Amino acid sequence: AGVDPLVPLRQAMFNYFQVPDRLGILTHLYRIAEGAQQGDPLSRSWELLKEGFLLALTQGR
C-alpha cells in the first residue's frame, strides 16, 4: 500500500483548528452545523467559509 495522500490535508486542518486529531475537530464542525440549522448565514455559506479552509490547506507550503 502506498502513502495516504490525505495525511498532509488532515494535518493542515488539525493545525488550522489547533486540535490533535479528528475528534478534536468535531467541536468546530458541530458548531458550524448547529449555526446552519438555526439559519445563520455565515455557517450556511461555503463561499464565506472556503477562504479559511483554503488557507489551512496552503499554510504548510
Swiss-Prot record:
Binding locations of ATP: 45
Enzyme class, spelled out: transferase
Keyword terms of this UniProt record: ATP-binding, Immunity, Innate immunity, Kinase, Nucleotide-binding, Phosphoprotein, Transferase
Catalytically driven reaction(s): N-acetyl-D-glucosamine + ATP = N-acetyl-D-glucosamine 6-phosphate + ADP + H(+); aldehydo-N-acetyl-D-mannosamine + ATP = aldehydo-N-acetyl-D-mannosamine 6-phosphate + ADP + H(+); N-acetyl-D-muramoyl-L-alanyl-D-isoglutamine + ATP = 6-O-phospho-N-acetyl-D-muramoyl-L-alanyl-D-isoglutamine + ADP + H(+)
Record-level GO BP terms: defense response to bacterium; innate immune response; N-acetylneuraminate catabolic process; positive regulation of nucleotide-binding oligomerization domain containing 2 signaling pathway; response to muramyl dipeptide
EC numbers, comma separated: 2.7.1.59, 2.7.1.-, 2.7.1.60
UniProt pathway: Amino-sugar metabolism; N-acetylneuraminate degradation
This protein's record includes keyword Repeat: no
Modified residues (Phosphotyrosine): 30
GO MF: ATP binding; muramyl dipeptide kinase activity; N-acetylglucosamine kinase activity
Record's function text: Converts endogenous N-acetylglucosamine (GlcNAc), a major component of complex carbohydrates, from lysosomal degradation or nutritional sources into GlcNAc 6-phosphate. Also has N-acetylmannosamine (ManNAc) kinase activity. Involved in the N-glycolylneuraminic acid (Neu5Gc) degradation pathway. Also involved in innate immunity by promoting detection of bacterial peptidoglycan by NOD2: acts by catalyzing phosphorylation of muramyl dipeptide (MDP), a fragment of bacterial peptidoglycan, to generate 6-O-phospho-muramyl dipeptide, which acts as a direct ligand for NOD2.
The protein's assembly and partners: Homodimer.
Family indicated by similarity: Belongs to the eukaryotic-type N-acetylglucosamine kinase family.
Listed name of the protein: N-acetyl-D-glucosamine kinase
Species assigned in the record: Mesocricetus auratus
Lineage of the organism: Eukaryota, Metazoa, Chordata, Craniata, Vertebrata
Name of the gene this protein is made from: NAGK
